[in-house]
Amino acid sequence: MASLLLFVLVIQIITYLINTIGARTIDSLLWLLYIKLPNQASQVAREQRHAKLEVIRLKREMSATSSQDEFAKWAKLRRRHDKAMEEYDVKNKKLSALKTSFDWTIKTVRWVSTTGVTVILQFWFSKSPIFDLPRGWLPWQVEWILSFPRAPLGTVSIQVWGGACGTVIALVGGAMGVAAPAFKKINQPRGEAQKMGTPRGSREQTPVRKTQ
C-alpha cells in the first residue's frame, strides 16, 4: 500500500496548493495560456482585441474632429465607430461564452482530480489498511480511532491517513509562510541596513571657542 499512501499524500498537496494560490488565479493563468494556443478561443481573442483597438482609434478621431465645423467627417466617423462597437460587442460576447465554457471544464477537471478521486479512493479502499501499527504500541481505543471507519483494528485507514496528511501539510505551509519573511529579513544585505544610519555630511561639529 506504499503507492496508495504516496498517492493520497500527493492529492492532499495538490489540494493545498490549489486552495493557497486560489482557484480563480489558477483559472485565469490557464485561460491566458489556453488563448495562446492555436484554437478557436485564440482566434476570437485576437479579433476581439483588434475590434477594441479600432473602437479606441475611431473614438480618438471623433474627439479630434469638431462636430460643428466638420460635421460630415464627424458623422462618418460616428457611423464607423458605432459599427466597430457593434462588432466588438459580438466578439466580446462570443469570447465570454468560450471563457465560461473553459472555466466550467477546468472546475470539473479540478474537482474530479482532487475531491472526486479522494471520495472514490476512500470508498474503494475503506477496508484496506494504509499501513500496520506495531502490535501493542497503542491502546485499543486509539487503534480503533486510527482504523475508523472500516479498516482492520491495529491499522491506519485511508480516511485517517488523508486527514492527517491534510493537517500536517497545512501546518507546514503555514509555518513556511510565517518563516519566509523573517528569513528574508535576516538575509538582508548589511549595506542596506547601514543606509538607514547617519547620512554622510551630517556629523555634528564640535563648537570652537573664540579667543579674545
Curated annotation (Swiss-Prot):
Topology Cytoplasmic: residue spans: 25-110, 173-212
Keyword set, alphabetical order: Coiled coil, Endoplasmic reticulum, Membrane, Transmembrane, Transmembrane helix, Transport
Residues forming coiled coils: 75-99
Lumenal-facing ranges: 1-4, 132-155
Keyword Membrane: yes
Positions of transmembrane segments: 5-24, 111-131, 156-172
Bias (Basic and acidic residues): 201-212
PANTHER family: GUIDED ENTRY OF TAIL-ANCHORED PROTEINS FACTOR 1, TAIL-ANCHORED PROTEIN INSERTION RECEPTOR WRB
Subunit structure: Interacts with GET3.
Protein name (record): Protein GET1
